[in-house]
Amino acid sequence: FGTKPYDESSFNDKNKEFGFEIRYYKGHLNKNNVLLTQGVDAVCIFVNDVADAEVIRVMAANGVKLLALRCAGFNNVDLNAAAAAGITVVRVPAYSPYAVAEYTVALMLSLNRKIPRASWRTKDGNFSLHGLMGFDMHGKTAGIIGTGKIAKILIHILKGFGMNVLAYDLYPDYNFARQEQIVYTSLDELYHNSDIISLHLSLIH
């Protein structure tokens, strides 16, 4: 469900090894189209699909045994309902931490230098710098909340920009802090002394 051309291309290429029968639906899974799962063993969904208790119940009645997510998050799935229905749920365990960290830097640069707005203006023939001025990241302070694998790679990149780094984590890695010359501090200190703040932690309810 929720498939794009690149999904179909990837699945078709990999399926040459297995020969599974695969049905592709562009629409997102929900209670209105869950009947399409009739007669299938597994259903594959993405972030905008809905697998709540009602959808899970219908899938189980249709004989679905596996629900595979093409993403790391699973907040769109009622895990308790799936377990009760005997449907196994699997997900992407992790993305490339380098890709996520590098994309984070790209977002920082885009926000700081107002790159999207500048792009729109130049397409309209407007080359004014008014409202587009950013600041040099060199010498500024980045506040990083959560210092897991992705955040550590991000910190290494930001140090290459010549930035100072303040960090907060419930379980500080002081060996890493010494290696990268960063400072663990309180959230309050981080909020008040950072020019840029980046969050790298799980969603907490």
Question: What is the meaning of each model-derived region?
Answer:
Residues 66-68, 88-90, 128, 166, ...:
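Structural detector of well-ordered beta-strand residues that form the stable sheet scaffold
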Residues 76-80, 99-103, 177-178, 195:
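Short, charged, surface-exposed secondary-structure boundary motifs
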Residues 85-87, 93-141, 153-156, 160:
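Phosphate-binding beta-alpha-beta segment of Rossmann-like dinucleotide-binding domains, i.e.
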Residues 130-205:
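Rossmann-like dinucleotide/phosphate-binding beta-alpha-beta segment
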